[in-house]
A protein has these predicted regions:
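Short Cys/His-based metal-binding microdomains
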Residues: 77-81
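Solvent-exposed interaction patches of small proteins and small membrane subunits
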Residues: 46-53, 69-73, 95-100
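N-terminal intrinsically disordered, cationic/polar leader segments
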Residues: 1-55, 62-66, 105-124, 128-137
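Conserved interaction-surface patches within small, structured recognition/assembly domains
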Residues: 61-75, 86-90
Length: 137
């Protein structure tokens, strides 16, 4: 399994293949289209991530001391972002998530791609992932 750093580098290299912001958006949309199916029973307010322009649901599941997530959004860009975040931080020990260097995500240069509202949404998703990790430590 790749480390968090290796996963972030993978997404950086993938995004760097595109010169145009629209192509990067298409990459995010492709991530959303390839996401796992979200169980409908979790589509409720208790799993909704506040602070996102779109509706985003993030559900933790702990199995064999590995934290992973069910996730979904009603908007492709947001769903693409939550897909990437859950791929980077999912299937890991909660302590590994808590102790990771979240500033490494800055290498993805999302601040130049996303609108301020979407950046806030990504921040909210990341905070929810941290919150879930902390709750299982």
């Amino acid at each position: 399994m790749k480390t968090i750093e290796e996963k972030i580098n993978y997404y950086k290299e993938s995004l760097d293949l595109f010169d145009d912001g629209m192509d990067k958006y298409k990459f995010l949309i492709d991530q959303a289209k390839n996401a796992k199916i979200f169980p409908e029973e979790y589509r409720n307010d208790s799993f909704k991530v506040s602070g996102c322009q779109a509706q985003v649901w993030l559900v933790p599941k702990l199995k064999e001391n590995k934290l992973s997530f069910y996730y979904d959004s009603d908007a492709f860009i947001s769903k693409g972002m939550v897909t990437i975040l859950c791929d980077i931080y999912g299937d890991r020990n909660p302590s590994e998530i808590k102790n990771s260097d979240f500033s490494m995500l800055n290498t993805l240069e999302l601040d130049t791609l996303l609108t301020p509202g979407r950046r806030n949404g990504v921040y909210s998703m990341l905070e929810k992932i941290k919150e879930y990790a902390n709750s299982y430590i």
